[in-house]
Amino acid sequence: MADETRRDFLKAAAAATLGAGVPAQAQTSATSSTPSAGPADRPADLILRNGKIITVDVGFSIAQAIAIAGERIVAVGPDAAMAAHTAPWTRVIDLKGRPVIPGLIDGHAHMDREGLKAIYPSLGRVRSIRDIQDRIAELARGKKPGAWIVTMPIGDPPYYFDVPNILAEKRWPTRQDLDAAAPNNPVYIRSIWGFWRHSPPLVSCANTEALKRAGITRDTVSPVSTLKIEKGANGDPTGVFVEQDMQPLAELIWFRKATAFGRADRARTLPLAARAYHAFGTTSIFEGHGAATELLRAYMDAYRDGTLSMRSSLVFSPNWKTAGNAPLGPLIEAWAGWLGEPGPGNDRLKVTGLQVSINHGAADDLRAGTTPDTGWAGFNYDAGMPRERLKEVLLHCAANDIRAIAMANVTPGVIDLFEEVDRLIPLKGRRWVVAHISSLSPRDIEKIVRMGLVLTTHTNAFIYKQSDLMKRRLPPERHREITPVRDLLDAGVKVSLVTDNVPVSMFLPIWQVVSRMNIRQELVAPEQAISRAEALRCATENGAYLTFDEDKKGSLAPGKLADLAVLSADPLSVAETELRDISAAMTMVGGKIVYETTNWRG
């Protein structure tokens, strides 16, 4: 690579760093905010009493009350012990027996997507093409002629199951259907992000004016075999695009200008997204799939504006295309100052670690061509690279104390690859992450233990929605290897639960690892079930361990951050079938209420 090109790549990489824009108060080392317990008689600003405080401490103790001063916990214990922390100004809330847990920590959240869903009008609950036409016509009445009309997908969120069969016509709307509803405007109905449903196809629909603006005619040829431009008997496009993939391409290459999420859109909707997660008791997230530059900047904007209520640990998603075949050692070394552990940031926002994966396909190259726009992804589509090239990157990461995060479902053999690195530079203590585990053999688990790897699950996929696929991949005698959380915990592995934004409640994965129930009400490797207490620990303490924050959060103890949730039901005693339906009555981050339902104290 020419020196000039390489300098451009280094410059672009530097521009993505938080160091270029983190306020001074956020550039302190992560270790600077290690908590220290206050004096036993310190007055509290707030006391929650007469409750069931599930501390998730070492002994999983249960208390009645918790006292908070500033952003930290000063006492946990019986109601009577709170007198020592009560001052004239102390606010006291009677929990009336309600359960309280540490704030939940989502180990792979994709939180930003929840806010982005609010930008475009919903087509949820439509049951006919006429319903769709009525919605589009209503939107057209509020638009000037020629202005774009873009909507969310057809179907009912969060999963968008059984489309188009939910429509009376059992088909997708054509361009003519949409023309009739909005003859003077270009119309585009987006496809789903495939991981919401975990099954293709992804289908989007456009009217005649939208096709014209996209330059799509009867002669247009799809750039990849997985994307079909549906055409009628006369050879003209019908306006329907069908993708046998999980990440939409049509909207990126043909309708990008109409569908792109701007930096302001991302920053503006992050608070909406955070509130949706807070509604189920989540107070911290880890974005293990990585954040591209546009998403990093959006988080920084929200942080500067004081609207980022969620504690957010981000991972960098690189754009490798510009690097070409140049040696990557100097680049990784240059990143060490802001991606290493501990890195810049604070308890509210930090970026540490590098998301890595093996290879990418032709469709990913096309998606990457839209950089810096990343659509629903929020990560760079060309983060994958050949195995030997990736090994080079991993060795440089290990040498520079940069943590690597890889998703097992898109990085085949990642544990073996990490082991090759471990033979040269020991990984123990570095907490490298294997995400989206689907199945693990006993030998895999032995390697994980030896290297001290941290794991994040994806139970919404591999237990709930795709267990049939997992069973087909493995012989019956190996079905116990499907998301083997029981075996992992017994081996001492730290496992963090995740939502992947499908949907946002952490009580779904909590229920899934306890019940091992799939969408068809079938048990999946039931011998791998764990207890409710263990599931809560995976969703709290282990999530804190994932981000090197176990001394600051993850349990309710004096000196720790006052991140907690008052729940609608007791996760330790509610009927198992109702465990997944638990929500938060009140959620608190750093001693401040960030979410509460109306009259929850009544």
Where are these regions (language model features)?
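N-terminal secretory signal peptides and thylakoid transit peptides that target proteins
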Residues: M1-A16
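Hydrophobic h-region of N-terminal signal peptides that target proteins for export
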Residues: L18-P23
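Boundary at the C-terminal end of the N-terminal hydrophobic targeting segment
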Residues: A24-T28
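Divalent metal-binding segments
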Residues: G38-R49, I54, V58-A336, G343, ...
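Short, charged, surface-exposed secondary-structure boundary motifs
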Residues: A214, T322-N325, K465-L469, F507-L508, ...
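His/Asp/Glu-enriched, well-ordered alpha-helical/loop segment
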Residues: L394-M407, P412-W432, H436-S438, P442-E446, ...
